[in-house]
From Swiss-Prot:
The complex is composed of two ATP-binding proteins (DrrA) and two transmembrane proteins (DrrB and DrrC). It is a peripheral membrane protein. The keyword Lipid biosynthesis does not apply. One of its GO terms (biological process) is lipid transport. Part of the ABC transporter complex DrrABC involved in doxorubicin resistance. Responsible for energy coupling to the transport system. Binds ATP. Its EC number is 7.6.2.-. It comes from Mycobacterium tuberculosis (strain ATCC 25618 / H37Rv). PANTHER family: ABC TRANSPORTER ATP-BINDING PROTEIN, DOXORUBICIN RESISTANCE ATP-BINDING PROTEIN DRRA. It holds the Pfam family ABC_tran. Residues 8-240 form the ABC transporter domain. Inhibited by reserpine. Keywords: Antibiotic resistance, ATP-binding, Cell membrane, Membrane, Nucleotide-binding, Translocase, Transport. This is Doxorubicin resistance ATP-binding protein DrrA. It is found in: Cell membrane.
Amino acid sequence: MRNDDMAVVVNGVRKTYGKGKIVALDDVSFKVRRGEVIGLLGPNGAGKTTMVDILSTLTRPDAGSAIIAGYDVVSEPAGVRRSIMVTGQQVAVDDALSGEQNLVLFGRLWGLSKSAARKRAAELLEQFSLVHAGKRRVGTYSGGMRRRIDIACGLVVQPQVAFLDEPTTGLDPRSRQAIWDLVASFKKLGIATLLTTQYLEEADALSDRIILIDHGIIIAEGTANELKHRAGDTFCEIVPRDLKDLDAIVAALGSLLPEHHRAMLTPDSDRITMPAPDGIRMLVEAARRIDEARIELADIALRRPSLDHVFLAMTTDPTESLTHLVSGSAR
């Protein structure tokens, strides 16, 4: 792939804190094409926000390089800043100003004339369905409206790269869908997007590729379907109507339920999962055995691994992350 197709090129980036004792990022490399959406996933403290901070020139890497829209984040930070938009969980607009005033202010800061800034503000208020609230102080906006005006300010001049750090956290479903639609529009405009999110179904729906990072290291990369395939084959999920019947179901399934799956059951378990390489045949046989044992079920179905399964299978437990943090691994 030609370099001019690439909006983001990260090569061997390393970042440490505490005089090198805490490794936030360790030899991270990836590329993002123009118009591509990359989902950056990982548990808390994995290094996602540190990566966004480096790519947006808020902090410098200790080693490695990162090129954004042709500009080096260390030697050409001004060029990088002219080429990007960044939105995070904290809205970065002025609550004392109206939505329109914020947009005009950003336009003027970008060097637009007064008339051009007002015209662009009107266009963005229309695009983000905020015309009715344009004259109101942003401090009176709802969470979804505040997030939309924040993103709109980042689009006063179209960026080449967008960094969206958990943009839908805390939003209601309607506002969240509006952000999803916005990300889809970025693709059409050729804007490369790096999305961090705590909602795995969001990454599944929006991302062309997903990068899974844990303890500062990329542990998996690929499309959502490729990562799901790595997490395992189709499995059968069985939910009893009465949780007291779990042991009876285990007995009825017999050899269908592998020993290590039996060992995973705890007093708090509310369902049984087992591999189903034969798909529907396994489901039918399991249902037959349970029916013969006269056990009532709330549900029995074939499932495919979701990104939740990928996440749980490939990343460490948050309590382990705390242990690594104390001992000098990722931030």
